[in-house]
Design a protein with these regions (language model features):
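Short, basic/aromatic beta-hairpin or loop at an interaction surface
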Residues: 42-55
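Basic, polyanion-binding surface patches
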Residues: 37-38
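Short, compact, well-ordered microdomains
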Residues: 54-83
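Short proline/glycine-enriched turn/loop segments at secondary-structure junctions
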Residues: 18-19, 45-47, 64
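Short aromatic-glycine-enriched beta-strand elements
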Residues: 22-31
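Structural detector for short beta-strands of small beta-barrel domains
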Residues: 3-16
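A broad, low-specificity signal marking well-ordered, structured residues that form hydrophobic/aromatic
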Residues: 8, 28, 55
Length: 83
């Protein structure tokens, strides 16, 4: 199986009000990084030019929400999944 690796960064964390105080919901938004620290394209595996895209996740686990901070970078591996 071939894997495509993408480097994304957190561009938004939006906390939404929930009717119950013990419920949480945050919308986490990520976008592709344009260049690596060495100035070379960070996402050359999948984009020959300026990479574009967006990942949005609705997260309801407080421990998971705490793992994301604005500006933080992540590698995201796309590996085919079986049914």
């Amino acid at each position: 199986m071939a894997t495509v690796r993408a480097k994304f960064w957190v561009t938004g964390i939006r906390h939404l009000h929930q009717p119950s105080p013990d419920q949480v919901f945050a919308e986490i938004t990520l976008a592709p990084v344009y260049a690596g620290q060495d100035g070379k394209p960070a996402n050359a595996d999948w984009s020959k030019a300026t990479p574009s895209g967006e990942i949005k996740m609705g997260v309801t686990n407080p421990a998971a929400i705490e793992k994301f901070t604005l500006g933080q970078k992540f590698y995201i591996d796309f590996t085919p999944a079986e049914d």
